[in-house]
Amino acid sequence: MKKTKFLLVAVDILPEAIRKTAEVKELLSKRPELTVNEAVEKVGISRSAFYKYKDGVFPFYHKASGKIITLALNLEHRAGVLSKVLNFIAQYQGNVLTINQNLPLGGIANVTISIETEEMKVSIEELLEALSQMDGVSKVELVGQS
């Protein structure tokens, strides 16, 4: 049995047909009422190109949904910053499994949080982006998933 090998590649270096295949798949997942014909027409790719690549193109965070992810964050040493982060995760149905916070050094605390993502109401990518924009959060990084 052939084992499939995966690579993490920046989208801007991919050929147009593969990028557009990913766009069609995203469009179909967000708008299930669309047919493949309608989606490929909207994106501007042929049906044959879509069918050629569709089984080999996945968003990076797609494989992590329904799984456990581990985030590493740098938080400012101020009252309420960690609480706001945890409340935000809970607001979108992320289930916090573990929290490890180191003593603050230079006004920054390193925090590692493991989250079960199965019931989350936002994508992992959206969660990471929103957390990185929060006041008091200077770094957010996905360091593991299982």
Swiss-Prot record:
SUPFAM superfamilies linked to this entry: ACT-like (SSF55021)
ACT domain residues: 70-145
Ranges in a coiled coil: none
Superkingdom, taxonomy of origin: Bacteria
CDD domains named in the record: ACT_PheB-BS
Protein family per UniProt: Belongs to the UPF0735 family.
Protein name from the UniProt record: UPF0735 ACT domain-containing protein CHY_1913
Source species of the chain: Carboxydothermus hydrogenoformans (strain ATCC BAA-161 / DSM 6008 / Z-2901)
